[in-house]
Amino acid sequence: MDKEMRRPSKLTLGAVQLGLRYGIANRDGMPDESAAQEILEEAWQRGITSFDTAAAYGESERRIGAFVKRHPELASHLFIATKGALEPTVTLDDEAYKSALFERLEISKTALNVPEVPLYMAHRYEDYRRRLNAYTSFFGQAKDQGHIRLAGISLYTPEEAEEVLRLSRKAPLLDALQIPFNLFDRRFLENELLDKLKAAGFMLFIRSVYLQGLLFLSPDTLPSALREAAPLLRRLQSLSSETGVGLREMALGYAHERAAPDSILIGVETVTQLRENLDAYEKRLPSGLIEEIDHTFSKVPTPVLDPRKW
C-alpha cells in the first residue's frame, strides 16, 4: 500500500479500553495483556486497520506497540491515531511549549514502535486554542520532519468545530477531526456543520457512537447525574423491540448512514464484543428507521450528551 494513500478503515478500534478501565457501562474492566493482544489480532484479521489511542490512555499505546513489534510487516498498512497534551497549568513560552510537545510525541512514537505517526491529534481543543501559535509551529515542523503524517484535534462541541473552520482558513495545518455523534447526539448535523467540515477537506472520525456505553444501560439504574436520560433510554429500548433492530446495529447503522464519516470508533473490552460490533456494522437499517430516530430523539438535554458533565 502506498503510504500516501493510507487511510483509516471504516471502523477504527478505539483502544482506550485496552489501557485503562473506561466507559459507564464497562463491566469487564481493562483486559490483561494477552486479551488485549487477542483483540488487536482479531481486529486486524477482520479488516480493521486503524487504531485510536492516546498518551493518556494508560497501557494502550504500549500494547499497540507490542502488536506492531510482533507484526512489523503490518506497520506500513496500519493507520494509528494517537493524541497528546500537556497539563493545562503549564506556563511555558511558545518555543518551550513546542519542545515539550515534541518530547511527548517521541514518547508516543517509542511506545507505538513507529517511526512516523499517521495521525497525531491535540487531545483537548481548549489547549490547542490557547496555545495556537505553539501547536501550529509544532504540527508544521512535525510534518516537515516526518514525525507525523496528519494533524488533528479531538472536539466535543459544534462551537469548537465552527472555530476550527474559521482558523483553518488562515492556517490550514489540520487534516482530521474527531467528533462525538450518536443516536442522541446529532448536534454536528445542525446548520449543515458536518457537510461544511467535509467540504473543507477534513478527515472525520466519529467517537462516542454508544455515548460511552450509556445506550446500553438500564433506565432504572442510572446515576443521579443522568436521570434525564431515563425516558430517552426507555424510548430507545421500545424502538429496538418494535423494529427488531439491536442497539449496536441501530447505533452503528445510524452513524454510518446519517453522518457518513471516514471512520467510526468502536471500543471493546473483549473479543466477543468486537465480533458483535463487526457483525452489527455489516447490517443496514430498515427503511424509515433513520427518520424515526431523528423524530424520536430530536430534543435531548445537553448534560446527557457530554460525558464530562456526568
Predicted regions and their residues:
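Acidic (Asp/Glu)-rich catalytic clusters
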Residues: 7, 67-79, 109-114, 141-143, ...
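N-terminal binding-site loop/beta-alpha segment at the start of enzyme catalytic domains
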Residues: 1-78
